[in-house]
Amino acid sequence: MAKLHDYYKDEVVKKLMTEFNYNSVMQVPRVEKITLNMGVGEAIADKKLLDNAAADLTAISGQKPLITKARKSVAGFKIRQGYPIGCKVTLRGERMWEFFERLISIAVPRIRDFRGLSAKSFDGRGNYSMGVREQIIFPEIDYDKVDRVRGLDITITTTAKSDEEGRALLTAFNFPFRK
């Protein structure tokens, strides 16, 4: 089992129960899933780019990504409905905890000119979204084998009812928010 999951059960639950005066352990917010999304708009011209992006996402997450397709045609972007334009992975359970641990301790500190993550990226329901400009911050990606630098979106979905609870949950995991 991931160390971060044990830490959540032993430390974070107790801390949040006293902070928010919950009656039951089941009221304490928890991380439900982590979604990684990589939009590859250039895949319209070159299908190989999407395969490389999917390979990067597989290396980062340890799970085969789902190829996302365009919902509707947009003439300005030269895409038709059903064109493959990106890939995404939804992590839950053990893989989610392992990825979350690597994200906090290894990947985020490797971001260039890192001064902390914005605490304003919550959606109103306790879920946190962040964008990463370079996939090479993850140690699983070999810098020499990267065909081009791509960014990805990371969404951490929690069971928190409000942004305040979500922020308290992520702060308990030592999530590096900007002061």
Swiss-Prot record:
Could you tell me which Pfam families the record lists for this protein? Ribosomal_L5, Ribosomal_L5_C
Q: Does the keyword Protein biosynthesis apply?
A: no
Listed A to Z, the keywords are:
Ribonucleoprotein, Ribosomal protein, RNA-binding, rRNA-binding, tRNA-binding
Listed under GO biological process in this entry are: translation
A GO cellular component annotation here is: ribosome
Q: Name one GO molecular function term.
A: structural constituent of ribosome
> What does the UniProt function comment say about this protein?
This is one of the proteins that bind and probably mediate the attachment of the 5S RNA into the large ribosomal subunit, where it forms part of the central protuberance. In the 70S ribosome it contacts protein S13 of the 30S subunit (bridge B1b), connecting the 2 subunits; this bridge is implicated in subunit movement. Contacts the P site tRNA; the 5S rRNA and some of its associated proteins might help stabilize positioning of ribosome-bound tRNAs.
**Quaternary data:** Part of the 50S ribosomal subunit; part of the 5S rRNA/L5/L18/L25 subcomplex. Contacts the 5S rRNA and the P site tRNA. Forms a bridge to the 30S subunit in the 70S ribosome.
What name is this protein filed under?
A: Large ribosomal subunit protein uL5
Species the sequence originates in: Edwardsiella ictaluri (strain 93-146)
